[in-house]
Amino acid sequence: SLFELGKMILQETGKNPAKSYGAYGCYCGVLGRGKPKDATDRCCYVHKCCYKKLTGCDNKKDRYSYSWKDKTIVCGENNPCLKELCECDKAVAICLRENLNTYNKKYRYHLKPLCKKADAC
């Protein structure tokens, strides 16, 4: 769910997920279209593509369990879809952390209409 995703992003990056990534670039947040603006935005693009592969669970509402051991996210689910959902969220959180050095505040509240046609996954 959005709750676990936000918690993972906070744990990995130390940033407030809604404020820092809620409207970042063309892909972070609700909508997604156009060319990713930078590496951080590309993380969100890949994350949206990961969600598109999920079948049988709701990425916004369905809760899953994970643990934070030695600063590492460990997904712990028996349900295959929820496990995959957790892995999608884990991957974006790690990607965002790995690209903190290129995070650009000018894309924090990027206007989505400036993002042109969709990039296919």
UniProtKB/Swiss-Prot annotation:
Its main location: secreted. SUPFAM superfamilies: Phospholipase A2, PLA2. InterPro entries: PLipase_A2 (IPR001211), PLipase_A2_Asp_AS (IPR033112), PLipase_A2_dom (IPR016090), PLipase_A2_dom_sf (IPR036444), PLipase_A2_His_AS (IPR033113). Residues 105-117 are annotated as: Important for membrane-damaging activities in eukaryotes and bacteria. Expressed by the venom gland. GO terms for molecular function: calcium ion binding; calcium-dependent phospholipase A2 activity; phospholipid binding; toxin activity. Disulfide bonds join 26-115, 28-44, 43-95, 49-121, 50-88, 57-81, 75-86. Keywords: Disulfide bond, Myotoxin, Secreted, Toxin. The record marks 111 as: Hydrophobic membrane-disruption site (MDiS). One of its GO terms (biological process) is negative regulation of T cell proliferation. The record marks 105, 108 as: Important residue of the cationic membrane-docking site (MDoS). It is found in: Secreted. Coiled coil: none annotated. Homodimer; non-covalently linked (probable alternative/compact dimer conformation in solution). Snake venom phospholipase A2 homolog that lacks enzymatic activity. Is myotoxic and displays edema-inducing activities in mouse paw. Also displays cytotoxic activity against myotubes. A model of myotoxic mechanism has been proposed: an apo Lys49-PLA2 is activated by the entrance of a hydrophobic molecule (e.g. fatty acid) at the hydrophobic channel of the protein leading to a reorientation of a monomer. This is Basic phospholipase A2 homolog 2.
